[in-house]
């Protein structure tokens, strides 16, 4: 297991030890006239710095101090010395965080200070990120991972594996875009991204892997891949096209509708919210109110209007972008309704990169012809257990 892949798990375990031992967050020595420092920890990234500077320029009572970690060893040393930050902007496993008590539940503050205000977060995103009634982190921006399906076979968002299998068997269509035909790893990465979401539950202390359901799911993709590789199909229109939606002006390709990835019976539609880093507040912090004030600032319309490389999490700013594109005739009313439907019916949240990497390596071996589906499932189950055991040592 690569050390970088253990970052999320390491932070969770190290903070758990620190909070249990009664350590408090670290602040530098402050003079009587100096404003209090509230520390924000980030990993190898200072893109939040302009926002920090803008906040500090209007704040006299306290200042946000950015702590940039560029090595795992440094973070380990700081944490073991009891110098954890008040809040973090990191990429951590949302469901695993919910299983622990290391972070402040942000939902009461969201309900009290954000709901029905200009800083309100996209409700569908909050609902998806709420696990066991708790909200442990809020992203700065987001995108949606989904699939487009041929409209002549699918009528809208949410398709079952049975429906997709029926369409694949009844019609001579390639399952993937033709240009992907020789790109096994490309295919494997898409299947891996949703497999880690659909079949792994880390919201409890013990991971739950739905092994038999995963085997059925992987077999569907493998069967379609084998047929596409071995036959000359007289069509260049793929049955399904995996895609990411990073702006509300991205309607489906002509002849397609947003369907999400196929899912098994009783599962929600197969689209998911994706984001990189997200804000979280350490439960042992003495500056929870101040940390939340900074998060609120980051969610304000003024800050969210500058979001690029994804969609703003501020619901009013997101609606502004939709209205602007409608006014400029960049999208139609039907396109806007299609996006609203996709947003409204997205319930999953992207899996931890640690989990996705495990699936990707084993699934890639299947698509390359080096492993059978049942063998890949066993390997994934073993590696998931090993990953959790290794994580527990930190």
Short names for language-model regions:
Residues 1-4, 20-95, 306, 375, ...:
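Conserved N-terminal structural module of periplasmic/extracytoplasmic solute-binding proteins
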Residues 9-19:
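Bacterial N-terminal signal peptides
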Residues 73-88, 95, 220-251, 361, ...:
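Short helices/loops that flank or line small-molecule/ion binding pockets
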Residues 91-146, 257-266:
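Hinge/lid segment of periplasmic solute-binding proteins
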Residues 136-140, 145, 163-209, 236:
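Extracytoplasmic/periplasmic solute-binding protein
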Residues 202-231:
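Glycine-centered hinge/linker elements that transmit conformational signals in sensory
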Residues 252-314:
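Extracytoplasmic/periplasmic substrate-recognition and gating elements
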Residues 309-365, 390-394:
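Long, aromatic- and glycine/proline-rich binding clefts that accommodate carbohydrate-like moieties
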């Amino acid at each position: 297991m690569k050390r970088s892949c253990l970052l999320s798990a390491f932070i969770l375990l190290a903070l758990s030890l620190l909070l249990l031992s009664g350590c408090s967050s670290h602040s530098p020595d402050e003079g009587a006239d100096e404003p209090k420092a509230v520390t924000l920890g980030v990993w190898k990234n200072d893109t939040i710095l302009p926002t920090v500077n803008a906040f500090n320029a209007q704040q006299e009572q306290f200042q946000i101090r950015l702590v940039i970690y560029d090595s795992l060893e440094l973070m380990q040393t700081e944490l073991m010395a009891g110098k954890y930050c008040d809040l973090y902007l990191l990429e951590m496993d949302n469901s695993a965080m919910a299983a622990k008590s290391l972070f402040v539940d942000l939902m009461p503050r969201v309900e009290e200070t954000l709901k029905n205000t200009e800083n309100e977060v996209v409700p569908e995103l909050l609902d998806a990120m709420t696990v066991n009634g708790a909200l442990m982190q809020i992203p700065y921006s987001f995108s949606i991972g989904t699939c487009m399906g041929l409209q002549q076979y699918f009528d809208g968002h949410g398709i079952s594996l049975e429906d997709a299998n029926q369409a694949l068997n009844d019609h001579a269509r390639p399952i993937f875009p033709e240009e992907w035909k020789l790109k096994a790893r490309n295919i494997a990465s898409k299947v891996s991204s949703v497999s880690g979401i659909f079949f792994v539950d880390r919201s409890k202390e013990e991971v739950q892997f739905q092994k038999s359901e995963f085997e059925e799911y992987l077999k569907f993709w493998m069967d379609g891949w084998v047929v596409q590789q071995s036959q000359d199909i007289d069509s260049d229109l793929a049955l399904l096209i995996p895609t990411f939606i990073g702006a509300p002006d991205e309607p489906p390709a002509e002849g397609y509708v947003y369907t999400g990835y196929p899912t098994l019976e009783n599962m929600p539609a197969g689209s998911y919210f994706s984001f990189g880093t997200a804000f979280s507040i350490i439960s042992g912090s003495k500056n929870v109110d101040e940390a939340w004030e900074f998060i609120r600032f980051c969610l304000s319309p003024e800050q969210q209007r500058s979001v690029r490389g994804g969609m703003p999490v501020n619901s009013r700013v997101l609606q502004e972008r939709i209205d602007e594109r409608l006014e400029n005739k960049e999208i139609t009313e039907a396109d806007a309704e299609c996006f609203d439907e996709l947003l409204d019916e997205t319930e999953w949240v992207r899996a931890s990169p640690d989990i996705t990497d495990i699936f990707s390596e084993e699934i890639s071996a299947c698509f390359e012809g080096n492993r059978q589906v049942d063998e890949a499932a066993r390997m994934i189950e073993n590696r998931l257990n090993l990953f959790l055991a290794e994580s527990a040592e930190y």
